[in-house]
Each structure stands twice: as structure tokens, then as C-alpha cells.
Amino acid sequence: MSKKNQSNRLANQHKQSQGVVGIFGDDAKSHDITVGKISKIVLENLESEYPQLSFRYRESIKKEEINETLKKIDPELGQTLFVSNSSIKPDGGIIEVQDDNGDWRVVLVAEAKHQGKDVENIKKGILVGTNNDQDLMAAGNAIERSHKNISEIANFMLSESHFPYVLFLEGSNFLKETISITRPDGRVVELEYNSGILNRLDRLTTANYGMPINTNLCVNKFIKHKSKTVMLQAASIYSQGRGERWDTKEMYEIMLEISRTSLKAMGSDLFTQITSNK
């Protein structure tokens, strides 16, 4: 590597580290720090770590583009589209890398969902329900849109051997253990993780075939059944588990790990660029 390129890389690394310090400063659980902002910090890190590669960030993908990708796999796929300008827009956007053939390939897709304010309400002494006489609010269905986005990205990446979709869950509807919360008047309210009223994790684990959560499932799983081989594209689902907010530095580290796994999975298609001295 030339001295000029080395200098540029060090400058980029410094810029990236400044960004990390800025976003993960005093309040790592700030409501203002979105998964989209974290994605852009991940992008900066990747650009610094792999200066030979070209990356880009997109906020959305058009349904038309997804259909065109499907048609390349099989002409019978991707035929139906009623709204020409429809698109999907994951919370954290899409990071892509340009491969040795000049094609853009997905490195990371991230989303974060908060559902269930029972912990916050109990701590504040707020009662809920029609008559404002209940401690717990029945879980809603706000996370259903995640299923659509996961399916659309799975279609878009049907020809790939990796699926870097990461979904961060927080709030009382995604508990992994029973917790006890004390109200201002001293009364203790127990939130049971296996309550059908509260927990909505099972509605999302269909997107990873019931495999473990809080696990990097970026590399596709190939299973054999009788004479058939089936490829599984599983979302990597991470739940905070105690009804609290995610630490953004933790999110960043998970997203970076999944991005690196994607690049490793595409290694042979990036080899020429990675081994160049530009």
C-alpha cells in the first residue's frame, strides 16, 4: 500500500472513530440515536477497514428492482406488480458492496422495533386499559410490517448464500425472562415472559425457522431432506429481553459483525479487489 493510501486510510479510521465516540457517548440508549444512524457508522467503519472495496448506503429498494432480480433467477418469478413505485424501507437502510463484476450486493439490512411500554408505565404509576385500572396493556401487532420487509429482502437475495437481515427488538412485548417492576406506591408488578397477553417473540421467530435468537444467522443454512436440499434464509433476531432499550454500542458491534460475515461469504466475488494495491 502506498504512503498516500496509508495516510488516507489512517485519516478515515480517525474519522470513523470520532463518529463512534459521537454516537456512543454519554447516552448510549438515547431515543434520538436511530438504527439508521448506526448503519452509517458501520458503513464508515467498513470503508476504513476495506479501502479497496466500494460501499453504498440506500434507504429503500423498489419492488420493481426486487422483481427484476427474481426474473434473473427464473423467468416465472417477479411477474406481479400492481403499484409501480412501491418500495420497502427498512429502518436502518441497506448497506451494499460492489463485487468484482461491478454488481452491488447486500452487506447489511437492519431494523429496530420497540413494542410494549409496560415497564415505563409501571415505573411511572400509569394504569392502562379502557377504565385505566390495569397494569398491563395487551400486546399489539405493530411488528407485523417486519415480516413483509424480511420476505422482500429474502426475495431480493434469493441467489445469495447469505442473508444479513438483523432485527433488534425492545420493549415489554419481547421479554426473554420474567421481571418485577416496582410502582411509585411500592407495589411490585410481575411481567411474565411466557404470557400470551404480553409476548410477541413467537410471531417473529417464524422468520428464523425457530432457530436461536441473539445469534448471527447471516450465513444461509442448507438442509437435506430425503433427496432434496433446501436453502434457509434466516433473519438474525436480537431481543434486549428485559423490556429496556438497546445499548447502541452493542447494536453497532452486532451490525458490524454481521457485515463482516457477509463480506466473508462473498469473499471469492471480492477477491480481485481485496488483493489489489489501489
Stretch-by-stretch model annotation:
Residues 103-106, 119-123:
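Short, conserved acidic/polar surface loops in the N-terminal third of protein domains
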Residues 25-32, 36-68:
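N-terminal, Lys/Arg-enriched amphipathic/low-complexity engagement segments
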Residues 48-52, 98-102, 154-161:
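Secondary-structure boundary elements
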Residues 92-94, 106-114, 146:
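Conserved catalytic cores of phosphodiester-cleaving nucleases, focusing on short active-site segments
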Residues 110-117, 167-171:
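Short loop/turn segments at strand-loop or loop-helix junctions that form parts
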Residues 1-32, 42-48, 178-278:
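C-terminal tail/extension regions appended to the core domain(s) of diverse proteins
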Residues 121-216:
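Acidic, metal/cofactor-coordinating or nucleic-acid-engaging core segments within structured domains
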Residues 59-104:
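Active-site metal-binding core of divalent-cation-utilizing nuclease and nuclease-like domains
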